[in-house]
């Protein structure tokens, strides 16, 4: 109050994952951007996305979010093909609170930087808009990048990566070599010798059961 400085809006939305899956349908159907709401947002349409292709600098805001409200902690998936994402994420798809259909502007090829806009101004950037990401530490071709501490050298140590081409030839995130970090790994018995072996389980939960054979000597002598 009484200040001549304009109010600076808080940034209540954040990039969480940049996705370039190789889904069975192919094409652009595996492209998506994962975001998380840091606070309640009454109108998501004040935010937008831009894809800076091939190191050519900013392309400005190319996508504007729908005018919906979201709650703090909500996981938001902006996907070129929600139906293909539902199949590829399998049971993990339910982890997303909102799934929005993206326009063709969401066109990242695994070597493109991403800009998050608020009221037309850039508030967060993944990658370097002036650098083609091919061969860079932040390349995510046919893979994903996910915001999490772990890599001490790339992008300030704030992102981890699935590994280039790690989703090629797979049908779900769970049968790839790089399950998406948001997704709880299926648990069950992982021992193929057990009677209740679960081939879909990736984490052994200690539930394995084994058949026991008894040899009974019926000789009464």
Give short role names for the model-derived ranges.
Residues 46, 98-176:
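Conserved beta-structured recognition patch
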Residues 61-87:
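Intrinsically disordered, low-complexity Pro/Gly/Ser/Thr-rich segments with frequent PxxP/GP/PP motifs
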Residues 37-43, 52-57, 81-85, 118-122, ...:
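Acidic glycine-/aspartate-rich tracts in secreted/extracellular proteins
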Residues 14, 32-36, 48-50, 75-79, ...:
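Residues within well-ordered beta-strands of beta-sheet-rich folds
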Residues 38, 65-69, 105, 137:
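Short, surface-exposed secondary-structure edge patches
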Residues 1-14, 165-221:
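Primarily marks secretory-pathway-exposed extracellular/lumenal segments that are disulfide-
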Residues 7-55, 106-109, 217-221:
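A structural motif detector for short, solvent-exposed N-terminal "entry" segments of globular domains
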């Amino acid at each position: 109050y009484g200040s001549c400085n304009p109010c600076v809006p808080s940034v209540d939305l954040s990039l969480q994952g940049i996705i370039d899956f190789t889904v069975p349908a192919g094409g652009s159907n595996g492209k998506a951007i994962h975001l998380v709401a840091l606070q309640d947002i009454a109108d998501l349409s004040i935010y937008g996305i831009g894809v800076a292709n091939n190191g050519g600098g900013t392309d400005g805001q190319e996508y504007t979010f729908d005018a919906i409200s979201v709650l703090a902690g909500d996981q938001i998936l902006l996907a070129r093909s929600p139906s293909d994402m539902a199949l590829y994420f399998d049971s993990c798809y339910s982890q997303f609170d909102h799934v929005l259909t993206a326009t063709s502007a969401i066109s990242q090829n695994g070597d493109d930087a991403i800009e998050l806009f608020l009221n037309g101004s850039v508030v967060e950037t993944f990658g370097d808009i002036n650098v083609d990401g091919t061969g860079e530490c932040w390349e995510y071709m046919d893979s994903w990048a996910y915001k999490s501490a772990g890599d001490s050298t790339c992008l300030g140590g704030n992102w981890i990566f699935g590994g280039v081409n790690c989703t090629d030839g797979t049908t779900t995130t769970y049968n790839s070599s790089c399950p998406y970090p948001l997704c709880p790994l299926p648990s069950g018995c992982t021992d193929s010798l057990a009677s209740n072996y679960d081939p879909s389980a990736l984490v052994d939960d200690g539930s394995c059961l084994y058949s026991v054979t008894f040899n009974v000597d019926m000789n009464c002598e």
